[in-house]
């Protein structure tokens, strides 16, 4: 088996059961897939089922098949954090020994005061809140005062919300860059996020697609860096470029929804290249998981599942595809935060063995180790390749 292209598709927030340390995060009982299935009386995912999804963990409507089109397993998060950045970095070989800082009581004066001074405005909020709730609470005051809304969550994020007619997206992005410069050292949050919105009342406020993330960059090279350094290509889809600070990426298509992300993946698969295609499908997390909408979550899964045959038809000899996730965000549990869960591992390709139980991998960095072995790169500090099990 001579693999030339690896495609990694991250179903953002699609966890597959509580991790062993879920109690440390308040996430006992979380299971994004199975709990969603139970809430809607069964998932309809025949193509992922054929890959082995139902063999990883029981979930209503998704059985373990008699005939497989892929191999399957699950990966346990090792990094001390359950956020998007930690999950994606770990997949690419960076395990964080300490979590990014969080601010359940809001940001201290050492952060807020210089931020206010540099943007020349006050701020509203400065607390932990749901993104939709805080717009209902403070959106009208923001329109009246012109002050941006600053808030956080259980994740390591500094989020700035602003109405597009009050503070333009360009101005909002500049504020985020200022915040990113301030948030270093002990206050080095994982992400600064621009959250533009529209509407003229609490009932009509709606976040727009012009969200933008400003993530820290890894201190050591990731597999992305190593693939590019070896003279190969890295194509990114969705917010991958933001998550890695545009580092180790040859070409990016910053899509903002699942349908556009899938189209971008299909287009990149038409390109004759050797290297890595890394895509994030955001809607499970951003639109449905955080808003506790299991019906929408299930429908989004079904929409991706229905188009998997199109992706499979694009594959050629030398292709290997991985479908996984970065963390959970169980839409059926109280609260709107991420959940500490295992993530699914589905692997397939024209020359890849099917029906192999890859078991429980001890870190998401097993994916990085596998990519490193495929391309003859230096192995990451963490992770064990599963390539030999697929040959």
UniProtKB/Swiss-Prot annotation:
Pfam families: Metalloenzyme. Its EC number is 5.4.2.7. It comes from the Bacteria. GO terms for molecular function: magnesium ion binding; manganese ion binding; phosphopentomutase activity. Mn(2+) 1 binds at residues 12, 326-327. Pathway: Carbohydrate degradation; 2-deoxy-D-ribose 1-phosphate degradation; D-glyceraldehyde 3-phosphate and acetaldehyde from 2-deoxy-alpha-D-ribose 1-phosphate: step 1/2. Its main location: cytoplasm. InterPro entries: Alkaline_phosphatase_core_sf, DeoB, Metalloenzyme, Phosphopentomutase_DeoB_cap_sf. One of its GO terms (biological process) is 5-phosphoribose 1-diphosphate biosynthetic process. Keywords: Cytoplasm, Isomerase, Manganese, Metal-binding. It catalyses: 2-deoxy-alpha-D-ribose 1-phosphate = 2-deoxy-D-ribose 5-phosphate; alpha-D-ribose 1-phosphate = D-ribose 5-phosphate. GO terms for cellular component: cytosol. Binds 2 manganese ions. Belongs to the phosphopentomutase family. This is Phosphopentomutase. The gene is deoB.
């Amino acid at each position: 088996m001579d693999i030339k292209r690896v495609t990694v598709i991250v179903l953002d927030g699609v966890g597959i059961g509580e991790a062993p340390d879920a109690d440390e995060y308040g996430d006992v009982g979380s299971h994004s897939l199975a709990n969603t299935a139970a809430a809607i009386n069964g998932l309809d995912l025949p193509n992922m089922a054929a890959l082995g999804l139902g063999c990883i963990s029981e979930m209503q409507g998704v059985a373990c098949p008699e005939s497989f089109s892929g191999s399957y397993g699950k990966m346990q998060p090792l990094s001390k954090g359950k956020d998007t950045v930690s999950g994606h970095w770990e997949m690419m070989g960076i395990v964080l020994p300490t979590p990014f800082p969080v601010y359940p009581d809001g940001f201290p004066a050492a952060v807020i005061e210089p931020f206010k001074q540099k943007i020349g405005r006050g701020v509203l909020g400065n607390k932990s809140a749901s993104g939709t709730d805080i717009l209902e609470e403070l959106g009208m005051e923001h329109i009246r005062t012109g002050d941006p809304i600053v808030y956080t969550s259980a994740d390591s994020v500094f989020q700035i919300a602003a109405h597009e007619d009050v503070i333009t997206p360009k101005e909002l992005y500049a504020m985020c860059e200022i915040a990113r410069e301030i948030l270093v050292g002990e206050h080095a949050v994982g992400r600064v996020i621009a959250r533009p919105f529209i509407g003229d009342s609490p009932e009509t406020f709606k976040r727009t697609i012009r969200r933008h993330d400003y993530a820290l960059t890894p201190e050591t090279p990731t597999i992305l860096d190593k693939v590019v350094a070896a003279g190969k290509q890295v194509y990114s889809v969705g917010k991958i470029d933001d998550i890695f600070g545009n580092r180790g990426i040859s070409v990016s298509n910053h899509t903002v929804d699942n349908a556009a992300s899938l189209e971008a993946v299909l287009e990149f698969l038409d390109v004759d290249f050797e290297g890595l295609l890394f895509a994030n499908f955001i809607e499970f997390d951003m639109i449905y998981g955080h808003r506790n909408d299991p019906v929408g979550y299930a429908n989004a899964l079904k929409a991706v599942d229905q188009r998997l045959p199109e992706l499979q038809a694009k594959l050629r000899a030398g292709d290997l595809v991985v479908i996984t996730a970065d963390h959970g965000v169980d839409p059926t549990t109280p609260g709107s935060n991420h959940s500490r869960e295992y993530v699914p591992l589905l692997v397939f390709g024209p020359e890849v063995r099917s029906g192999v139980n890859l078991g429980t991998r001890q870190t998401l960095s097993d994916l990085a180790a596998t990519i490193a072995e495929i391309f003859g790169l230096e192995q990451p500090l963490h992770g064990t390749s599963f390539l030999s099990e697929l040959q």
